[in-house]
């Protein structure tokens, strides 16, 4: 077996349909108020999302067993070529750490240094110790720093471009991506260890190897067949646009609106025809002031009377006012589509917004915070236009330069030093419509969006009058006596409980270390 074959297994574990269904469609699209659910969970969407986090943990372990198997396999079978496979080893490591950051957001402490022993030549380590985030982050930062250096300097390397789903073998872009992941790590550290975070950011932003256009974005591109594996289509079975997100998109005439969602069928002719049907009840009557772009309430207590939520059909025409997400953004094969799939890890716009925030924190970066912000907004508009074309979404219409200029000139979008951070956070939230682990992480770090934020204003979520909160981590229970790796599992939980804001083991509202 060529060792690069294992790289595909790592890439495939970065996201799959199961993780997307459980974590995004059923949870974070709703928690972050991009969408409202029309199927699944209902009253317990903010408390008992039982499947949430299970697949991301499984995918982390899959990525780990293959990423750490690569160097062992080479040492055991191709020792004379070990140096020539340095790039392959480091690329797999970068992917694993990226997945580790995501997984640790949900679970806190993870097995890493001692993990996957049976796959990497250490079969004696059957019960690995767990490491806290405070221990993991310096390890990951150092490994990323070393990986960037090796990727920049390695020579006489064996090509794996046919298995490189991000950059097709372009190692200069992998160096930039590695530094981008370091900046992501630094942002996680900003609350707990601000000086260390800023030192990492300073090092990255002065390195000369950072993203400078949308084509540098750290994105995995899969083929059409990959999008047929699992329930990628479920986004349109489960979710519709939220009133919060649609209000924002309409208020600022954001051209990404037509890329994120499909226009509804509420033409004047269709509305008149539906309202005239003998079978249309008074409750089903469609108000004539509804537009082609509408969102629905996320709050359970408001859904029963939400006219935008009611399911209606005119023959086979879907007349529900709430807009459907563009399904091919998730499943290129939807409706006989021919496009592939994509997994955003760190986009150029994402990088710009992180750099803008660190610049506001006093980190010299070669640009002002305003320049980073404006570059990020433009990059987001251009990237989403490009990716929507790649996905062959329904009724695709590219975003024009004129639309970008008009959007950027609006009050609330044009740079305003008095609300600079909120502007950065708002645009970060929009950018992460698909990569919503990151908008969730931002919410956990800075509390944005919220019911009091101005550019994007969440609605308060109530279930039978009780105010709901966004979950912040996985619920835990102590392992049963005699269960695998019992002592280390117990120590893991006891160590996390030492943090004052960790909360009860079984509370999804407790905090992981970096949030505090």
Where are these regions (language model features)?
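Conserved, well-structured interaction surfaces
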Residues: 34-113, 117-159, 338-343
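Internal, well-ordered domain-core segments that constitute the primary functional module
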Residues: 138-222
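Extended ligand-binding clefts on enzyme/binding-domain cores
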Residues: 201-352, 359-457
């Amino acid at each position: 077996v060529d060792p690069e074959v294992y790289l595909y297994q790592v890439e495939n574990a970065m996201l799959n349909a199961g993780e997307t269904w459980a974590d995004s469609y059923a949870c974070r699209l709703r928690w972050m108020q991009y969408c409202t659910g029309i199927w699944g969970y209902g009253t317990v969407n903010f408390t008992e999302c039982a499947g949430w986090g299970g697949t991301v943990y499984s995918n982390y372990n899959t990525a780990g067993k293959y990423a750490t198997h690569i160097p062992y396999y080479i040492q055991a079978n191709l020792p004379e070529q070990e140096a020539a496979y340095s790039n392959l080893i480091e690329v797999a490591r970068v992917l694993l750490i990226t997945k580790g950051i995501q997984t640790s957001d949900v679970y806190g402490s993870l097995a890493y240094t001692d993990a996957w022993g049976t796959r990497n030549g250490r079969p004696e380590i059957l019960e690995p110790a767990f490491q806290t985030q405070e221990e993991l982050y310096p390890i990951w930062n150092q490994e990323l720093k070393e990986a960037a250096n090796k990727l920049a300097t390695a020579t006489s390397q064996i090509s794996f471009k046919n298995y490189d789903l991000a950059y097709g073998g372009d190692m200069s872009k992998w160096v930039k991506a590695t530094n981008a992941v370091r900046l992501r790590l630094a942002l996680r550290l900003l609350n707990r260890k601000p000086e260390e975070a800023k030192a990492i950011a300073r090092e990255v932003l002065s390195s000369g190897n950072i993203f400078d256009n949308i084509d540098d974005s750290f994105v995995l591109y899969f083929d059409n067949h990959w999008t047929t594996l699992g329930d990628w289509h479920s986004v349109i079975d489960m979710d519709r646009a939220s009133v919060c997100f649609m209000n924002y998109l309409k208020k600022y005439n954001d051209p990404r609106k037509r890329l994120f969602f499909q226009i509804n069928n509420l033409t004047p002719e269709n509305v008149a025809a539906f309202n005239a049907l003998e079978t249309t009840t008074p409750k089903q009557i469609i108000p004539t002031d509804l537009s082609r772009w509408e969102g629905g309430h996320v709050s359970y207590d408001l859904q029963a009377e939400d006219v935008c939520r009611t399911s209606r059909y005119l023959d086979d025409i879907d007349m529900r006012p709430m807009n459907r997400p563009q399904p091919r953004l998730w499943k290129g094969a939807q409706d006989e589509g021919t496009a592939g799939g994509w997994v955003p890890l760190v986009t150029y716009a994402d990088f710009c917004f992180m750099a803008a925030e660190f610049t506001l924190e006093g980190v010299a970066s070669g640009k002002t915070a305003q320049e980073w912000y404006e570059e990020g907004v433009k990059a987001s508009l251009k990237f989403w236009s490009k990716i929507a074309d790649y996905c062959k979404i329904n009724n695709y219409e590219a975003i024009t330069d004129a639309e970008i200029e008009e959007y950027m000139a609006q009050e609330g979008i044009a740079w305003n030093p008095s609300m600079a951070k909120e502007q950065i956070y708002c645009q970060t939230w929009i950018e992460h419509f698909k990569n919503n682990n990151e908008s969730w992480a931002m919410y956990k770090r800075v509390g944005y969006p919220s019911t009091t934020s101005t550019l994007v204003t969440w609605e308060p979520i109530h279930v039978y009058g009780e105010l709901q909160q966004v979950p912040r981590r996985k619920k835990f229970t102590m392992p049963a006596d005699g269960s695998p790796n019992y002592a280390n599992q117990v120590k893991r939980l006891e160590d996390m409980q030492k943090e004052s804001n960790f909360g009860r083991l079984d509370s999804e509202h407790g905090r992981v270390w970096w949030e505090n």
